[in-house]
């Protein structure tokens, strides 16, 4: 198998002219990605002694002088890069900035093992708290009544003479905004695809879809162009007031009704009250059993007070997780709509929203409901082979692929009343929802201290009540949950939590059956554990065996109590089990399935570093992506970002911000062709190195200024009010001096 083989992808025609020509070199002539100071003894002679190769391929591979090459000591935790690509990078503090590897806990928030008051460690370590991204806005604010209207036919402004925004279109275009961007050939990417632009006059490419028309009376009018013949009929909602092809948009009036408690959630309230009563009854039964003085008659009286739940759960839509369905993990900040859309393009068969909190969902807060938006590509069924669909497997026989989709929502909640209400709200207002996932693993301090996320790991009874209640009100939408091994190291809790989520406690199960959890994902780490330690796939394998034992004994369990009810069982009477942690290649993926016996693998950081990991899984081989191909993915993200957030000043600022968040992971990718041995490990950090061309070197930079330069290849110069602070301080360099 050729490790350098790659699957061809379409490249933007303007890529070479707009991106590669914008590659910026540093003042000393070295690639901007590396602030290289050559060894004092070698000076310029060290550079002269470098050997240039691969001239025939148009690439410049630089080999350091013999004195610069260090012995191959195979350092644990360090990526094994070929000697000819290594360089020496010395910063003012006399150490390599890469000596401190990136702290992936920064992506999830400070954990309890770190102090919440004074910062324990200062300088370049740790994460930047309360990051400021500045503000990208026009100097003159154009009224929305003018934004999408031609000059002589504006919409009515509800504020009238009291409006403090500009209604003078020509003044706005001349003085109130930056000049049009020159990237993408000066043509609006949204207009080129859809035939109209929902940013209207605020678009930073507006010159490409406007014209001045002379009317019969001699007046000249500025008009917006529309060419709806360019666009295909969307599967999702499309309007000139919102993103094209985006589904799960909730009307403002509905969110306002939620905020005023005007939405009917009586089913949730009724079920929560019943569950509180039944939980109290279970406690009394338990106390009666342990009290030897209680007579059997009293136990019988307590059992007689049992009341059936007010309603039964609806039968759920069938799910399928298997070898062909790698799943993108729910990712805070990075798991935005454009990135998920990119991963679906590259082969992700399942996606999740960023984690939303139950209480703001119930209150109708815009920030949480915005996380529920999905692209129409996420509403398509997972791609399965004809052999799988024709299988005689009992799971596949009851699975309807045409009714399935890829996008699921993830929520966190600290109590069953909140979780039940949130589940009812989501299933009421979101028509495109594969499943609702309960987060029982988030390590963020704020979530943990509120009793949600990983705090639930120590409260297995609460996990069962939440899943049982959500399952009761979610209609046909299945309920799943995501766990960690536990809270503290050497104190695993996952097996107990899986037992409660799948089987239920004996008291509940005897009367109500199983809770109805359709799938469980286990992240192979504890809350306390750092990302520098590998995920525990051995423990995941033990939990997979527990799930299999449930499958084997399911009929035995249900037959001893009552005839199983389809509404109390997981879809297809199966509980799928997903593993999560350190999956970085097709080799990791298939090893997890074959050796740990999970149904499929959920991929998080691996997809952030190289989104084409899904392509590798489908191809069954490593793909050595060139710098041009990788830049094509960045361009695609920018296009998707502008479609989602707009091509105006604010939308491009938002796209730039989330692109930089993506690049804060993507720079860590070490091309396969530069490695001495395979497989690559996700926690291996590379020493300073040069790429096979200048663009590849730039993409490997851990300096956030270089990430901004990459963003400017497609989004133009950053607005003067734009700011960016990386999550991890080691990427910031001189940020303290900048204030």
UniProtKB/Swiss-Prot annotation:
Residue segments, region Disordered: 1-77, 92-133
Compositional bias of kind Basic and acidic residues: 32-51
Keywords: Cytoplasm, Flavoprotein, FMN, Metal-binding, mRNA processing, NAD, NADP, Nucleus, Oxidoreductase, Repeat, tRNA processing, Zinc, Zinc-finger
Enzyme Commission identifier(s): 1.3.1.89, 1.3.1.-
Record-annotated active site: 442 (proton donor)
Zn finger limits (C3H1-type): 137-170, 187-212
Biological role: Catalyzes the synthesis of dihydrouridine, a modified base found in the D-loop of most tRNAs. Specifically modifies U47 in cytoplasmic tRNAs. Catalyzes the synthesis of dihydrouridine in some mRNAs, thereby affecting their translation.
PANTHER family from the UniProt entry: TRNA-DIHYDROURIDINE(47) SYNTHASE [NAD(P)(+)]-LIKE
Protein family according to the UniProt entry: Belongs to the Dus family. Dus3 subfamily.
Protein name according to UniProt: tRNA-dihydrouridine(47) synthase [NAD(P)(+)]
Organism: Pyricularia oryzae (strain 70-15 / ATCC MYA-4617 / FGSC 8958)
Encoding gene, per UniProt annotation: DUS3
């Amino acid at each position: 198998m050729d490790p350098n083989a790659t699957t061809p992808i379409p490249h933007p025609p303007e890529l070479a002219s707009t991106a590669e020509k914008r590659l910026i070199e540093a003042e000393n002539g070295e690639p901007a990605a590396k602030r290289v100071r050559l060894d004092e003894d070698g000076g310029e002679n060290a550079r002269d002694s470098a050997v240039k190769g691969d001239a025939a391929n148009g690439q410049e591979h630089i080999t350091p002088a013999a004195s610069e090459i260090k012995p191959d000591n195979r350092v644990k935790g360090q990526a094994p890069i070929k000697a000819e690509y290594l360089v020496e990078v010395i910063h003012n503090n006399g150490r390599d900035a890469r000596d401190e590897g990136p702290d992936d806990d920064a992506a999830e928030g400070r954990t309890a093992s770190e102090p919440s008051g004074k910062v324990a460690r200062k300088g370049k370590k740790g994460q930047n708290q309360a990051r400021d991204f500045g503000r990208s806005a026009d100097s003159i604010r154009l009224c929305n009544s003018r934004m999408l209207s031609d000059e002589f036919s504006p919409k009515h402004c509800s504020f009238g003479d009291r409006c403090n925004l500009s209604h003078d279109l020509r003044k706005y275009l001349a003085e109130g905004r930056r000049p049009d961007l020159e990237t993408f050939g000066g043509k609006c990417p949204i207009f080129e695809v859809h035939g109209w632009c929902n940013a209207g006059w605020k678009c930073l490419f507006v010159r490409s879809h406007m014209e001045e028309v002379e009317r019969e009376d001699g007046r000249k009018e500025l008009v917006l162009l529309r060419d709806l013949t360019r666009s295909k009929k969307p599967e999702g909602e499309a309007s000139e007031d919102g993103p094209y092809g985006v589904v799960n948009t909730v009307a403002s009036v509905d969110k306002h009704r939620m905020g005023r408690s005007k939405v009917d959630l009586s089913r949730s309230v009724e079920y929560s009250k019943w569950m509180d009563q039944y939980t109290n009854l279970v406690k009394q039964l338990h106390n009666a059993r342990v009290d030897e003085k209680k007579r059997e008659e009293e136990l019988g009286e307590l059992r007689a007070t049992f009341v059936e739940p007010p309603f039964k759960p609806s039968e759920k839509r069938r799910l399928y997780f298997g070898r062909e369905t790698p799943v993108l993990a729910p990712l805070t900040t990075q798991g935005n709509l454009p990135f998920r859309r990119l991963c679906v393009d590259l082969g992700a068969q399942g996606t999740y929203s960023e984690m939303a909190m139950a209480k703001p969902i119930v209150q109708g807060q815009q920030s949480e409901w915005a996380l529920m938006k999905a692209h129409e590509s996420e509403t398509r069924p997972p791609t399965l082979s004809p052999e799988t669909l024709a299988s005689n497997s009992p799971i596949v026989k009851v699975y309807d692929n045409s009714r399935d989709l890829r996008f699921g929502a993830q929520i966190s909640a600290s109590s069953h009343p909140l979780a039940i209400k949130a589940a009812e709200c989501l299933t009421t207002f979101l028509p495109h929802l594969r499943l609702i996932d309960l987060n029982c693993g988030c390590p963020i301090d704020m979530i943990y201290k509120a009793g949600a996320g990983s705090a639930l790991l120590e409260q297995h009874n609460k996990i069962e009540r939440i899943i049982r209640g959500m399952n009761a009100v979610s209609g046909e939408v299945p309920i799943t949950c995501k766990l960690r091994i536990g809270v503290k190291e050497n104190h695993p809790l996952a097996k107990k939590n899986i037992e409660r989520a799948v089987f239920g406690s004996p008291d509940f199960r005897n009367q109500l059956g199983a809770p109805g959890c359709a799938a469980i994902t286990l992240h192979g780490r504890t809350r306390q554990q750092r990302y520098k330690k590998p995920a525990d796939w051995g423990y995941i394998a033990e939990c997979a065996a527990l799930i299999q034992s449930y499958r084997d004994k399911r009929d035995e369990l249900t037959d001893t109590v009552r005839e199983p009810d389809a509404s109390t069982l997981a879809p297809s009477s199966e509980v799928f089990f997903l593993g999560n942690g350190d999956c970085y290649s097709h080799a990791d993926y298939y090893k997890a399935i074959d050796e740990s016996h999970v149904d499929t693998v959920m991929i998080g950081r691996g997809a952030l570093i190289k989104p084409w990991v899904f392509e590798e899984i489908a191809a069954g081989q490593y793909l050595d992506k060139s710098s041009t191909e990788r830049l094509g993915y960045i361009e695609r993200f920018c296009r998707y970002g502008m479609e989602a957030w707009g091509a105006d000043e604010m939308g491009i600022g938002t796209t730039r911000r989330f692109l930089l968040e993506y690049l804060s992971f993507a720079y860590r990718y070490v091309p396969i062709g530069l490695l001495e041995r395979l497989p690559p490990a996700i926690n291996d950090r590379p020493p300073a190195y040069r790429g096979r061309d200048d663009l590849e070197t730039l993409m490997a930079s851990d300096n956030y200024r270089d990430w901004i330069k990459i963003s400017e290849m497609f989004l133009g110069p950053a607005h003067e009010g734009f700011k960016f602070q990386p999550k991890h301080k080691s990427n910031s360099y001189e940020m303290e001096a900048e204030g």
